[in-house]
Amino acid sequence: MYIVGIDIAKRKHEAAVIDGEGTVIIKPFSFTNNCSGYNRLLAMLAKAKLPLDEVSFAMEATGHYWLALFTRLQKEGFRVQVINPVQTNSIRSFYIRQAKTDPRDALLIAEVIRFGHFSESTLHPENIYELRELCRGRHAIVSMQADVKRKVVALLDQVFPEYETAFTNMFSDTSMAILQTCPTPKELSEMPLGDLCHLIEVSSRKRFRMAKAQELQELARNSFGFAMAGDVFSTMIRLYAKHLDFLKQQVREMDRKIAEIMETLDTPITTITGIGPTLGAYILSEIGDISRFSSAAKLAAYAGIDPTMRQSGEYNGVRNRMSKRGSPYLRHAIWLAASSAVLHDPALKLYFQKKRDEGKPYMASVGHACRKMVSIIYAVMRDNKAYTPYIPNEISA
């Protein structure tokens, strides 16, 4: 057996080859992350006269840079193993000189495979991979929305602090129409009342009319906001409001694409209380093949909601926190699902209340509910059966 350890980088990879005894067969060499580099990799193996059916390739899951080489090797029939960088670091700690260089890392990656104590990262099926990219992209855009909203609020707090009292939701369609047209007290108070009333009536679908227009102009005339740099504040608020509209359209487009993929999967995950199509997509795309996990505890560790253990001698930690070492996207989705389920699912609601009655804070109680939610998700995905809520006679701790 020959192991090709590859240290992945953006433009240039480093590779080295060892045999089953750990003897270096090919010293570390570099090759570019393109077709000519790939050909150089194969040429180096051919030069060493290595039988390709006895060669195994190993690489770290470094960002997204490993995907192109991984898929090319797999397509051509090679055995490829992908490991977590944490596992390479654990091997490095055994060496007295814990140097980190690309050539040395290529050898370390090969050694990890030779020792056999590793868990492989896998490339999900294409539809799951597409779903994951969409969900992560959606998460990024929603984060942008939150950031832009904070900027709008900060500007309005300075120039028009009374504005937030006019709407239950400052970012409703009606409010956004006003922020894109007349966002400052001066512009709002000087706008003809009839024009303002028409704008409000159209944007609110006739929910608001003259009374809301009069209320807004009264607030504008009596505003205690910062009077300087009005043109700049107006420009910034208008631009941010238009940016929010654009981001909102992008989220809708992503949601449509996510829904299309979810329809093809025919999954029972959305039968779980607290998990709708969007959260279900996040969870499915991050987990992938549930058979990768032998237990719900392994899935909890992957999500990073397993408790950290603190033990030394006779000491056992009693205030253990979430490890938060797994997928942040999966952890966030499970947290949202559990937060909803403790309000609507009979068993989780009772379990959550039990933890609250024990004196645990709200967030800690939701954390316990998250671990129960993981068990439910694991069982539903493992058995591929719809979830049936129930109230147990006794709720286990």
Regions found by a protein language model. Name each.
Residues 1-397:
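A detector of single, family-specific signature residues
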